[in-house]
Amino acid sequence: GMVDTLMLSSVSDQAVGAVGTANTYIGVFIIMFGVISSGMVAVMSQNIGAGKPGIAYQARQLGLVFNALTGILISVVLAVFSGGILRAVSIAPALLESAETYLKIVGGASFLNALIPIFSSYLRVFGYTKHSLIGTVVGNVINIILNSVFLFVFNWGVMGVAAATVFSKVVNLIIVAAMGAVLIKAKQSPERAQPRKILAQIVKIGFPSAFETALYNVAMTFIVCFMNHMDTDGMNVTARSYAMQIANFSYCVGAALAQANAIMTGWRIGAKKYEECDRGTRKAVIYGLVTATCFSVTFAMTGRFIVQDRKSTRLNSSHL
C-alpha cells in the first residue's frame, strides 16, 4: 500500500485518494479471513509447543480450505458489484472511476489476501520467519518494478498499479506456498485430531480477534463515507490516504511484535510454560511502545514533504 501511494503521488493526488478509498472497502470485506488466520496461528503454535506438529498441519489445511472458499466468494462480489458499492457510500465523483477500476481488479483478486496469510503463518509458527519475509520482499520488489513500467512507460495509471499489485501477490503466494511444502514436514507426523474439534478451536480463538478488527474497519468505513460528503474533489479522502499509509509504518512495528509474541506465547502455552508468556508479553509491549512512538513523532514532522498539493499538504499534516 505504501509503495502504491508513493508512486501514485507522482501521478496525481486524486489517484491516491481513489486507491485509498478502494483499499478501505477491500479491508472491510476481507475481515472474514482474519477469523481463520488468527485462530489458526494460535492453534498451530500451541500444538507445536505441545509436540504435535501433525495437528498443526491439520489446522493449516482447514484454514486453507475455509479461506479459499470465502476468498473466491468475496472476489466475485467485489469484481461484480464494485461500482455499486462505491456509489452506495457516496464516493466523491472525482474519485469514482479510478476507485472502481482499482476495486474491480484488486478486489476481484482478494482471494490472494485469503491464501497468503495461511502459508506465511504456517512458515512463521514453525520458526521460518525469514523465509516468509523473503516472499514479501520479492513481491514488493516486483510491485515496484511493475508500477514503474505501468505508470511511467505505458501510462496506465491506477489500472497499472492494480495489475502490478495483483501480480506481485501471486508471486508472493507461490513463494511462501513452495517454501512451506519444502521446509516443513509436519504432514508426515502421525498426530491427528477430529477436524470438527480443530475448526471449533480456530473459530473460538479467531472470532474475537476478527471482531475487534471488524469494529475498527467499520469505523474507518463511516469516516471515509463522511469525508466523501465534505467535498466533491475528494481532497479530504486523499489526505487521509496519505496519512494512513505513512502511519502504517508505526503500526507495522506493533503488528510485527504482536505476531512474534503470539507465536511464542502459543509455543509456551503448549509447553505449559505460563510464566514465560507473561514476561515475553511485557517485553513486547515496552519495545513496541517505544519504537512506535519514535516512528509517530518522525512522521508527524516529515509527512508534509510527500504531498504535492498545498491544500492536501495542510490536511495531511493535521491528520498525522
Residue ranges and their predicted role:
Residues 165, 174-216:
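Interhelical loop/hinge segments that connect adjacent transmembrane helices in multipass membrane
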Residues 315-320:
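Single conserved hydrophobic/aromatic residue that forms the stacking wall/gate
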Residues 73-104, 294-314:
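Short membrane-interface helical motifs at transmembrane helix boundaries
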Residues 130, 140-173, 303-308:
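Membrane-interface helix-loop junctions in multi-pass transport and translocation proteins
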Residues 27, 67, 106, 132, ...:
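Residue-level signature of transmembrane alpha-helical cores of multipass secondary-active transporters
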Residues 2-17, 86-93, 149-156, 214-245, ...:
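Helix-terminus/linker motif at the lipid-water interface of multi-pass membrane proteins
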Residues 20-23, 67, 103-106, 110, ...:
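Residue-level recognition of transmembrane alpha-helices
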Residues 16-76, 113-132, 224, 237-303:
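Small-residue-rich hydrophobic transmembrane alpha-helices
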